[in-house]
Design a protein with these regions (language model features):
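Structural signature of tandem-repeat unit edges
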Residues: 1-11, 18-36, 48-105, 115-128, ...
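A cross-kingdom feature that marks long, compositionally biased intrinsically disordered regions
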Residues: 250-252, 256-271, 275, 304-309, ...
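Ankyrin repeat arrays, specifically the small/polar loop and inter-repeat linker segments at the C-terminal end
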Residues: 259-265, 291-301, 314, 324-334
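Conserved hydrophobic site in ankyrin repeats
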Residues: 285-290, 319
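Charge-dense, extended regions
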Residues: 305-359
Length: 359
């Protein structure tokens, strides 16, 4: 990977990325200086190439090469066509990007029309987001945010920019996995008043407002669960529920009870979906949660049969093992119950005999 960059006030600003791949992992430093800014239209195919060429000719831009030693090496930018330069990583060519920890600013329309971009990793230091940053980026599905001890970030601003359903992984000072449902806004004309009224659909906006002072509020997120149950499809609610239970960062007892109650109510469907998606992590969690249920054996048998039909050997193996353990536990419970009942009957008979003797 090669980067066109410039140095401003002892900090590196990335102007363009060149690579044969589809994923960009930007360096923390260039020439020993922290990378703090991504220029406008940096990953967009709509950048005015004339301006870029002019900066090249004037010597304002240099080239960073990831193949160099250490943090890469700085080179003079090849002005005449750049025969050794990979194609610009822009537009539909970009699928994932990892931003450096010191990055504070992203210029306007930096990812404009990157329609295949699915994954973005960034840090809490990022505070300045340009206009139209994710315009045309409708494929984004996953965000990873690395937080420092303060916990503040620009996550809400990014969530508002991307209305589609998103999975967010929090790392650093907190570790959590969160699912934010989609939302969309509709303009409805109020003719008598001569105004347009904005109607918001979906519970996604409720969840995107679970922030206070740029910090995520887990309690507010969990309090919105009734919105999701009423407005979202089963798959989305299942993803949200499993994410909170499997990564229970700051999950209060009442929140856990609400999620577990919903999961037990839809246990069969939840197991079925986990088998269909070959999700071993979810399958193991569900099997453990439902192990104490009276209908656990029937649920595990159904899930195992489905795993067989879908040619999911790892799932079949785990489910059969869980079923074996459950049956063994049931046999032990029945044996203990029988022993307890037998002892009670013996005690009762002994007591009656003793009473007759005393009389």
């Amino acid at each position: 990977m090669k980067l066109a960059y410039e140095i401003k006030k002892e900090e590196a600003v990335i102007r363009r990325c060149y690579d044969y791949g589809s994923e960009a992992e930007l360096p923390e430093q260039i020439e020993g200086r922290p990378v703090t800014e991504l220029a406008p239209y940096a990953f967009s195919a709509h950048m005015e190439e004339g301006a870029l060429e002019r900066d090249i000719r004037q010597g304002r831009l240099r080239l960073w090469d990831s193949c160099g030693a250490g943090d890469g090496r700085a080179e003079e930018f090849p002005v005449s066509g750049g025969k050794n330069l990979p194609p610009a990583l822009t537009g539909t060519g970009l699928t994932a990007v990892t931003l450096p920890p010191a990055l504070r600013k992203i210029g306007a329309y930096a990812f404009y029309n990157c329609s295949r971009l699915r994954y973005i990793s960034f840090c809490g230091e990022l505070t300045d987001l340009g206009a139209g940053l994710f315009t045309g980026c409708h494929a984004i599905r996953e965000l990873e945010l690395r937080l420092d001890a303060d916990g503040a970030s620009c996550l809400r601003e990014i969530l508002i920019e991307v209305p589609e359903k998103l999975t967010v992984r929090l790392e650093g000072s907190v570790k959590a996995k969160l699912v934010f449902p989609e939302f969309f806004e509709e303009s409805v004309e109020n003719t008598p008043a001569r105004i347009l009224v904005i109607h918001t659909h979906g519970s996604g906006m409720n969840y995107r407002n679970c922030f206070y002072d740029r910090k995520f509020d887990f309690r507010a997120y969990d309090a919105c669960f009734y919105h999701a149950k009423a407005e979202e499809d089963f798959d989305t609610v299942l993803e949200m529920t499993l994410a909170r239970l499997m990564y229970p960062e700051q999950l209060l007892p009442e929140g856990r009870a609400a999620y577990e109650a919903w999961l037990r109510e839809h246990a069969g469907q939840a197991l079925e979906k986990s088998v269909d998606s070959h999700d071993m992590e979810a399958l193991e969690y569900l099997a453990g949660l439902l192990a104490v249920e009276e209908r656990a054996e029937a649920l595990l048998e159904q899930a195992a049969s489905r795993a067989v039909s879908l040619e999911f050997p790892e799932g079949v193996s785990y489910l059969m093992d869980a079923l074996h353990r459950r049956r063994k536990e049931r046999r032990e419970e029945k044996r203990e119950e029988a022993e307890t009942t037998g002892k009670a009957e013996i005690t009762e008979i002994t007591g009656k005999s003793k009473s007759r003797f005393e009389l």
